[in-house]
A protein has these predicted regions:
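Surface-exposed, low-complexity/disordered segments
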Residues: 1-111, 122-124, 184-306
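Extended beta-strand-rich segments in extracellular/periplasmic secretory proteins, especially
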Residues: 92-148, 152-159
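Amphipathic hydrophobic-ligand
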Residues: 110, 137-143, 169-177, 208-211
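Transmembrane beta-strand segments that form the barrel wall of outer-membrane beta-barrel proteins
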Residues: 131, 159-164, 299-306
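Beta-turn initiation residues at beta-strand->coil junctions
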Residues: 133, 159-162, 194-199
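A broad structural signal for short, well-ordered beta-strand segments within beta-sheet-rich domains
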Residues: 140, 155, 171, 188-192, ...
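Extended lipid/amphipathic-ligand handling interfaces
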Residues: 143-149, 175-185
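Beta-strand-rich interaction surfaces with strong enrichment in secreted/lumenal proteins
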Residues: 165-166, 179
Length: 306
């Protein structure tokens, strides 16, 4: 959203759109939050025999997705595009492409590194390095590494950026910030994993900024009950995951919602009151879902088309 756009179109006609605009903490650009999804989960891992399962304890969402039957529409799209990033892998699979990790085995021949300074990161002395692809035409990251200045040479923090010139479809910019902490037993673990992507699907049409913030905590290396690994599937969804209270989310939420994110339900209710909005959603449903409801929440229909 630009200051010019704030003075025309829907922002001028419906002032509550302008009231919903905020400054992104990730890019410092003005944005209009339209969707938010929170997931609280627990991951268990066994080395031998190898097994890993994720138990989803709570899911909370609000925003534009509520108007579609496929309520996880945006989440499904993003899951298909994004994947977890492990900088300790030799290659990073992201945006349906493969990138050389800045600390992978092939990194030295792919990237150029520059020693910048010695800095403090969370009270730990670190060596600050920057890196760029050896060949500016190569498909790779630019970024910063903060390496602990001791015998471990562990990565304390890593930031990676995918420049627009890289040529990934629809992606104007992508930023990844990861931070690590050392456990009492000496192991280093990932604690913060933030990804921000700016998408532009059609030139001249308002783009999207998507933020994925992941926090890891409560690491425990004690033995896990064997029965948990006998649960079927790699992802287990608790029966009441969609019915968690506000008190539950207040207790597990590690990043507080912004004022505008907290106001999402009110904002969506006001959008529903806009004349003609239901026809826009009707057309969008037909296009996106290939399915059209003939009823409403208050008056469900026995017949749908799809």
């Amino acid at each position: 959203v630009t200051p010019e756009k704030m003075e025309k179109g829907i922002y001028k006609k419906f002032s509550f759109f302008k009231d919903q605009v905020e400054v992104s903490p990730k890019t410092n650009k003005m944005i209009l939050p339209i969707s938010i999804k929170e997931t609280s989960s627990k991951t268990i891992y066994r080395k031998s025999p190898k097994s890993e399962k994720t138990i989803i304890e709570g899911v909370n969402s609000s925003g534009i997705e509520e108007f579609f039957n496929t309520g996880d529409m945006l989440g499904t799209i993003l899951t298909d595009v994004f994947s977890d990033v492990n900088i300790y892998d030799d290659d990073i699979r992201l945006l349906q492409r493969r990138f050389v990790s800045p600390i992978g085995r092939g990194a030295i021949s792919f990237y150029k590194y520059y020693l910048m300074d010695t800095v403090m990161v969370d009270r730990q002395e670190c060596v600050h390095l920057t890196f760029v692809p050896q060949n500016s035409q190569d498909f790779g990251f630019t970024g910063h590494l903060y390496v602990v200045k001791d015998s471990t040479y562990a990565v304390k923090k890593c930031t990676m950026n995918l420049p627009k010139k890289t040529g990934v479809n629809f992606v104007d910019n992508l930023d990844i910030v990861q931070q690590f902490e050392q456990m009492p037993d000496g192991n280093w673990v990932l604690t913060d994993d933030d990804m921000t992507v700016e998408l532009q699907f059609v030139k001249g049409i308002q783009g999207l900024e998507v933020q994925r913030t992941t926090k890891y905590s409560n690491y425990n290396f004690e033995d896990i009950e064997p029965r948990l690994f006998r649960l079927k599937g790699n992802v287990i969804k608790e029966a009441n995951m969609l019915n968690k209270s506000d008190e539950y989310w207040a207790s597990v939420r590690q990043v507080p919602l912004t004022k505008k994110e907290s106001n999402m339900d009110v904002f969506m209710n006001r959008i529903e009151q806009i004349p003609g909005f239901k026809y826009v959603i009707f057309g969008a449903k037909a296009l996106i879902e290939n399915f059209v409801e003939t009823g409403s929440k208050k008056h469900p229909s026995k017949f749908d088309f799809g």
